[in-house]
Amino acid sequence: MPSAFVMISCNFGSAKDVTSELHDIDGVEQVLIVSGIYDIIVRITVQNKDDLDRLLLRVRRMDEIQSTLTLIITQSQ
C-alpha cells in the first residue's frame, strides 16, 4: 500500500480551510498545520499507485493550494 507525505503551501490565511477539506479525502491519514516554507503536511496511504495519483491530483487542484512537494515512503520500520 503506497504511503506518502505531502508538503503543501497554500494561500495566506487559508490553512484551516484547506485542512478541513483534506480531512474529507479518503486516504488522508493525518493533517498537520506547520510553520516554515510549507503550511501543511499530510500523510496519505492508499491501496495502489493509481489511487495515489488520483489523490495527489485532487489535492493539487484545490483552489487555495499554491504548490506541493510529495515524498513517497519507500521503507518504514
Enumerate the predicted regions with their spans.
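A compositional/biophysical signature of low hydrophobicity enriched in polar/charged and small residues
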Residues: 1-77
